[in-house]
UniProtKB/Swiss-Prot annotation:
CDD domains the UniProt entry points to: S14_ClpP_2
Pfam families for this protein: CLP_protease
Organism: Hordeum vulgare (Barley)
Name of the protein: ATP-dependent Clp protease proteolytic subunit
GO MF term (any one): serine-type endopeptidase activity
Top-rank lineage group of the source organism: Eukaryota
A GO cellular-component term linked to this record: chloroplast stroma
HAMAP family to which the protein is assigned, alphabetical: ClpP
PROSITE patterns: CLP_PROTEASE_HIS, CLP_PROTEASE_SER
Length: 216
């Protein structure tokens, strides 16, 4: 049976006793966000709103975005990516499970040197697709033209942030390309593989990662 959102004890600063609150509310307080579903308007508004709020609340401390998503809507993914580049805090992107399609684009959008893939994560990139391929011919042609512009823009971002030539990324995006964490690092999609670096930084810099993750 579904158990709903787990609750955990959390003591609000100034209170003597802890209260039981939703897990995700605690994570948000620790500046930790989750993208664990298909990318649609609702989750996009949720994540971008939290990023903006956390940036206003504290423009210095890092934000951590965990990703386990099969991808989703093109424009929604671009909205998250653009918000990540706009807010003042650095954003760690951490892939666990899978980051496919637009989710890999969001993973790529993390602060350079702060993009992480867990050892058994899978990353997939491919070209954007249209949802209107059954439209009438004039509408379809307009959609294809717009899709071509968006594809070129996304390809340029991949090329810029991975250091790969534009033509290499363009050819790779012609098909579904699945990568292991090590392959994604070699490609330039992520900077760190595994949790060894997390453990290292947690031991030496208590501020580097949220307190709750030190015992992982």
């Amino acid at each position: 049976m579904p158990i709903g959102v787990p609750k955990v004890p959390y003591r609000i600063p100034g209170d003597e006793e802890a209260t039981w609150v939703d897990l995700y509310n605690v994570m948000y307080r620790e500046r930790t966000l989750f993208l664990g579903q298909e990318i649609r308007c609702e989750i996009t508004n949720h994540i971008t709103g939290l990023m903006v709020y956390l940036s206003i609340e504290d423009g210095i401390s890092d934000i951590f975005l965990f990703i386990n998503s099969p991808g989703g809507w093109l424009i929604s993914g671009m909205a998250i990516f653009d918000t990540m580049q706009t807010v003042t805090p650095d954003i760690y992107t951490i892939c666990l499970g899978i980051a496919a399609s637009m989710a890999s684009f969001i993973l790529l959008g993390g602060e350079p040197a702060k993009r992480i893939a867990f050892p058994h994560a899978r990353i997939m990139l491919h070209q954007p697709a249209s949802a209107y391929y059954r439209a009438r011919t004039p509408e379809f042609l307009l959609e294809v033209e717009e899709l071509h512009k968006v594809r070129e823009m996304i390809t340029r971002v991949y090329a810029l942030r991975t250091g790969k030539p534009f033509w290499v990324v363009s050819e790779d995006m012609e098909r579904d390309v699945f990568m292991s964490a090590d392959e994604a690092k070699a490609y330039g999609l992520v900077d760190i593989v595994g949790d060894e670096m997390i453990d290292k930084h947690c031991d030496t810099d208590p501020v580097w990662f949220p307190e709750m993750f030190k015992d992982w």
